[in-house]
Amino acid sequence: MIKYPAFDPVAFTLGPLNIRWYGLMYILGFVAAWLLARSRALKTGSGWTVEQVDDLVTYSVFGVILGGRLGYTLFYETSYFLNNPLDIFKIWNGGMSFHGGLLGVIIAIWLFARHTGKSLFEVGDFTAPLVAPGLLAGRLGNFINGELWGRHTSAEWGMVFPGAGPLPRHPSQLYEAALEGVALFIILWLFSAKPRPRMAVSGMFLLLYGSFRFFVEFFREPDLHLGYLAFGWVTMGQILCLPMILGGLVLVGFAMKNEKQAALKTE
């Protein structure tokens, strides 16, 4: 068993304000996405300007925050927020949903595409590789907060988390950081470094994230108020990942089909 480091969730204070690690991780994720996007935009023939990147990141920030909070409200704590509607605005108390944030970003991308005259999937393919660093930062923030821990385990790397009882648990936040953050970024960044048919990068993101998250859910403790939703093992996270996996397969399939048709026309 490995001893949990027991971090202070407050990174530092500025007068009366407590600056928390989790909030800093969100900022770090947005800054990383912005820097990576600008590096891609500066390449010859990218079709993007740094001004467009700045606007895209601004749209995406609002999409992540609003979508993530509303998604958590609808998917995980509906009854609580119906009884306490004003608490929806208390983001500093925690409670964000990746799947809600994803929907928020998709809406933001659609609005940005309409504003700039770009196609939805042109923007989506450009954005997809930029998401993983934010996921990495967010999962590290969960680990620092000692939240969203895993199920009980007898593995040597099990940890006893504060408030999670005396038994060691999987550090599932770190599993997610490794798969949804590091592995997903490396795969998508390298995959998108070469010209790909439209929808391919977006489809790969949906397929890979959905698959990684579905797998890690087997090690992650389900939300106490939800538990398992089907067959004694299916979690809300897995249910929400299924449309991502299916959607990713469809997009990759369309991308491959369009690539073959384009190749035939040039012969």
UniProtKB/Swiss-Prot annotation:
EC number(s) per entry: 2.5.1.145
Protein source organism: Oleidesulfovibrio alaskensis (strain ATCC BAA-1058 / DSM 17464 / G20) (Desulfovibrio alaskensis)
Localization (cell): Cell inner membrane
Keyword hit for ATP-binding: no
Pathway(s): Protein modification; lipoprotein biosynthesis (diacylglyceryl transfer)
InterPro entries, sorted: Lgt (IPR001640)
Record-linked PROSITE patterns: LGT (PS01311)
The protein, known as: Phosphatidylglycerol--prolipoprotein diacylglyceryl transferase
Chief location: membrane
Residues annotated as transmembrane: 17-37, 56-76, 91-111, 120-140, 173-193, 199-219, 236-256
Keyword Transferase: yes
